[in-house]
Amino acid sequence: ILYEQPSYRGHQYYLWKGEYPDFQRWMGFNDSIRSCRMSPYHQGQYKMRIYERGDFQGQNMEFFEDCPNTYDRFRFRDIHSCNVFDGNWMFYEEPNYRGRQYYLRPGEYRRYSDWGASSARIGSFRRVHHLV
């Protein structure tokens, strides 16, 4: 996982297996990388519950699989809070795994700022798998 700022802050980018000759290939906003870390290996189930409002309020849904388009799936674009029970997940600001990325580990995220976002808009999300 690459971060634009020191101490794992700023825009984050998860690089899947492959080649990235320039920052635009990983959909970066610029070529500045100030910190990075490996994502932990996960083997087993994936489970996450998302909520339409903060503090785990409002309509919610559980997911075990990837979702390429949140609006098509459940008719809202904003995710205000979530619980990640199992596995590591990546939120994307736009559908089809595009735009700003937010890496989520197991834990509680009471508001979108807890995963580093400046807005609640999430267009897609997927499980983080390690390719061997």
Curated annotation (Swiss-Prot):
Record keywords: Eye lens protein, Repeat
Keyword Repeat in record: yes
Pfam families from the UniProt entry: Crystall
SMART domains: XTALbg
Gene3D superfamilies: Crystallins
Signal peptide (residue range): none
Region (Connecting peptide): 41-45
Protein origin, superkingdom: Eukaryota
Any GO BP annotation: lens development in camera-type eye
InterPro entries in the record: Beta/Gamma-Crystallin, Beta/gamma_crystallin, G_crystallin-like
GO-annotated molecular function: structural constituent of eye lens
Domain Beta/gamma crystallin 'Greek key': 1-40, 46-86, 87-129
UniProt free text on domains: Has a two-domain beta-structure, folded into four very similar Greek key motifs.
PANTHER family cross-referenced by the UniProt entry: BETA/GAMMA CRYSTALLIN, GAMMA-CRYSTALLIN-3
UniProt similarity note: Belongs to the beta/gamma-crystallin family.
Oligomeric and partner information: Monomer.
The protein's role, per its UniProt record: Crystallins are the dominant structural components of the vertebrate eye lens.
Protein name according to UniProt: Gamma-crystallin-5
Organism listed in the record: Xenopus laevis (African clawed frog)
